Curated annotation (Swiss-Prot):
It comes from the Eukaryota. Glycans are attached at N45. Residues 1-27 form the signal peptide. GO terms for cellular component: extracellular region; host cell plasma membrane; membrane. This is Secreted RxLR effector protein 153. Belongs to the RxLR effector family. Coiled coil: none annotated. Secreted effector that completely suppresses the host cell death induced by cell death-inducing proteins. The RxLR-dEER motif acts to carry the protein into the host cell cytoplasm through binding to cell surface phosphatidylinositol-3-phosphate. Transmembrane segments: none annotated. Disulfide bonds: none annotated. A motif (RxLR-dEER) lies at residues 48-63.
Amino acid sequence: MRNRAFLFGLFFIEYACLVLFAAPTRASLLKSNVESTLAEQWDSNGTRTLQADDSKRISAEERSMEQALLPGAEAMGKTKVPEKAVPRASLGSKLNPLNWPKRIWYKLRLWYARVRLYILKQKTTGENAIGIAAMEGLTPLSLKKLKNEIFHYSSSEPHDKWLIEKDYNSFVKHYFSQFYGLYQNPPVSEIDKWNILVEEMLPLERIAVRMAMDRVGRIVDKGYSIEKLISLDVSPLLYLRLMDSKGVFENVKENKDAIEHLRDYVEAYHKNVMM
């Protein structure tokens, strides 16, 4: 019995010693923690490197991440969400009472231009109607001005814009076709057909032609430049008829300068119309 107790005591003492020496001490724990902070790494050249995985490195990484994300976060914060448009009577709105006088004025000007265009269409319908209107002083520039007024005072593109452009181009082509003889050698006026047309006019129409001719004669006799004549919208066709009535084409050599001036004026007038 004593032997058994003695053996059991030795066994217990031996077991306690084994457990005591196998347990890690505080110093060994601290040492292992320090060693664990040094992680072995290998770079691309095969060189063994040690990287400290401590709190300082973690703090540096956090700061770098914060600096990288901060500009994006600030940009998101500065981005303005588009506000929903609120309908209001702005300065350019039709509901603004300040714009009503201007709109009424535009409507009146458009109506007046439309009436004038309608009268011209009625007046220039027929075989000799365009010639009569031209003898009374109708010019491509006056028709161009009327066309531009309709386009300008219309709130949107006119529904008959293509028709207005077509009639205008047709008139311009017919008008300047009367000057082909002016550039021949020797130049001819070909004005006889217009004189016959005037003789067949009604008395009131002949009065209108005479008044238009007198106006052109007064302006031309003042010796204005070509630019000034264009600004006054002197009819090239009436200018041609005026030169013919003065006998310029009967003696071309003596009136060469007057003919050249008329040619230059017709060319400049045509360029101005086509601008």
